[in-house]
Swiss-Prot record:
One of the primary rRNA binding proteins, it binds directly to 16S rRNA where it nucleates assembly of the body of the 30S subunit. HAMAP family: Ribosomal_uS4_B. The keyword RNA-binding applies. GO terms for cellular component: small ribosomal subunit. GO terms for molecular function: rRNA binding; structural constituent of ribosome. This is Small ribosomal subunit protein uS4. The keyword Ribosomal protein applies. Keywords: Ribonucleoprotein, Ribosomal protein, RNA-binding, rRNA-binding. It comes from the Bacteria. Pfam families: Ribosomal_S4, S4. Residues 33-54 are annotated as: Disordered. InterPro entries: Ribosomal_uS4, Ribosomal_uS4_bac-type, Ribosomal_uS4_CS, Ribosomal_uS4_N, S4_RNA-bd, S4_RNA-bd_sf.
Length: 207
């Protein structure tokens, strides 16, 4: 399955909620009707969505939020199910601990896609070493830094400025002047923002 490269706003409209694919800090609500499905007049149907349909829709939404394809998402779920504790919460914690997501949460990229590009282009150091694998799992205490040559990029400075205005998650500590952040701990479920019902995904894979 190829990665989606079409209009990002269309994906948010399809899910009926802002997935923050275009800008991490600016809502799409003022730009388009999120309650209207893609299409000239929006797709309408009097049929009630089945439980399976709702579960599948939720999985698709989470995949799009984090930019993960199906095979990789299944691996994340299998690992989440293997671990002790709540499977749904484990799944979100694994996704939030991805390097590209941590870079995004620290404000170095305005979107997860932009953060993923920074990682792939070797603009990110983890504990002083270049790491260009977006899916790499970051652990408590890991220090994420922008490579010296990349600190001059205007987009990074702009993204960081917006992040400072909206505030950083409690589970990361960011030193904007140093272009550096510390992954303090894996976030609790209450610390993970987003309109996500992970229990629907657990139900889907438990069928």
């Amino acid at each position: 399955m190829a990665r989606y490269t079409g209009p990002k706003a269309k994906l948010s409209r399809r899910e009926g909620t802002d997935l923050f694919l275009k800008s991490a800090r600016r809502s799409l609500a003022d730009k388009c009707k999120l309650d209207s499905k893609p299409g000239q007049h929006g797709r309408t149907s009097g049929a009630r969505t089945s439980d399976y349909g709702n579960q599948l829709r939720e999985k698709q939404k989470v995949k799009r939020i984090y930019g993960v394809l199906e095979r990789q998402f299944r691996r994340y779920f299998a690992e989440a199910d293997r671990r002790k504790g709540n499977t749904g919460e484990n799944l979100l914690q694994l996704l939030e601990s991805r390097l590209d997501n941590v870079v995004y949460r620290m404000g170095f990229g305005s979107t997860r896609a932009e953060a993923r590009q920074l990682v792939s282009h070797k603009a990110i150091l983890v504990n002083g070493q270049t790491l260009n694998v977006p899916s790499a799992q970051i652990k408590s205490g890991d220090v994420v830094t922008i490579r010296e040559q990349s600190k001059k990029q205007v987009r990074i400075a702009e993204a960081l400025s917006l992040a400072e205005q909206s505030g950083f998650p409690t589970w990361v500590a960011v030193d904007s002047k140093k272009f550096e952040g510390t992954f303090k701990q894996v976030p609790d479920r209450a610390d993970i923002s987003g309109d996500i019902n992970e229990s629907l995904i657990v139900e889907l894979y438990s069928r």
